[in-house]
Every structure is written in C-alpha cells, then in structure tokens.
Amino acid sequence: MPAGNVVLVGFMGAGKSVCGRLLARRLGRCFVETDDVIVARDGRSIPEIFRQDGEPAFRRLEAEALEALRLKADDVIATGGGLPCHEGRMDVLRELGTVVWLRGELDEVLARARRSGNRPMLDGRSSEEIAALYHGREAFYAQAHVTVDTAGLGIDQVVARILAALRERHAARV
C-alpha cells in the first residue's frame, strides 16, 4: 500500500466520510475530515458558519484547515465537496497524498446528502442549480490520481474498490 495520505474527494453525499472511516480502519490509519478540523478551530458548526458568515468566510476557514493538513502523514482525509474546487487546492491535495475521487450518480449522491441533513450548499437551491454545481465540480475532481465509481455500491464494496485501486497504483509505481 502506498505511503502517505489517502485523500477522498467528491460531491456531497458521495460517501467520503463513511467510506473514509472504514478505509482508515482497514489501513490502520487515522481518519480526518476537513469539516471537523474547521469546526474544532472555529467552534461553530458548518451550517452556523454558512448562516452567520456566508460561503466566502467558510472557504477561507477551509483554506486554513487545508494548510493544517500539510502536517498529516499516512492518514485518510475526507474533504468537503467544494474544497478541491477553489484556488489551486487540488494541487495541494495531490501533494498531500493519493487523491481518490468517489464518483457517484447525481441522483444517488443527492438523495444521500439530503437524508444526512446539515448541507448548507443545498439550502435554497433548485435541482437545476445543484446539477450545475455537481457538473461544474467534475473537472476538479477528475484531477484525482484515482477514480472509483460508487454507483449502486455499498460501503464495503466502495472501500474494496478503493483498496484495489490503491494497490494497483502502488504496484504500477514500484
């Protein structure tokens, strides 16, 4: 298995958090969520930050959290869905470790995101606006080292695919 961090990216509801926790357990690594880093540093929930200060303030906090992650090694990191899509951040993520895009079907990831609640990026947006956001982010996510299609798969299946992709990537580099 490759040394260094494994960084999970993808749209909200793609399974980054739940798959990241299981992946970290399977690899014997720590699990870190960028949103948790933001909450710990700021003292407010993500919805509170959005509501009180707006998205631009949240994106600044996200950039600070990303800088803090530069100190991490051999962890599994789950990013917020928008983190890779701003100000060269995908380049930073690629420097942190192997970036894995969890690519799911829009309807599927959106249904999961809505079920989980606390998604400020969904608030007040039409289905068309959310679809545009999803498709607008794909070009950023596509810069990942590895893409894992998650459509119709359960958590164990997704993690198995991530592990297989990481092994394959590591074998190709040795």
Where is each model-derived feature located?
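ATP-dependent small-molecule kinase phosphotransfer cores
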Residues: 30-94, 118, 127, 138-140
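Hydrophobic anchor at the beta1->P-loop junction of P-loop NTPases
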Residues: 8
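NTP-dependent small-molecule kinase module
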Residues: 1-2, 22, 26, 72, ...
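A glycine- and Lys/Arg-enriched "phosphate-lid" helix/loop adjacent to the NTP-binding pocket
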Residues: 95-139
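Walker A/P-loop
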Residues: 17
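Short glycine-rich anion-binding loops that position phosphate/pyrophosphate groups of nucleotides
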Residues: 81-83, 105-107, 153-154
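P-loop (Walker A) phosphate-binding loop of NTP-binding proteins
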Residues: 11-14
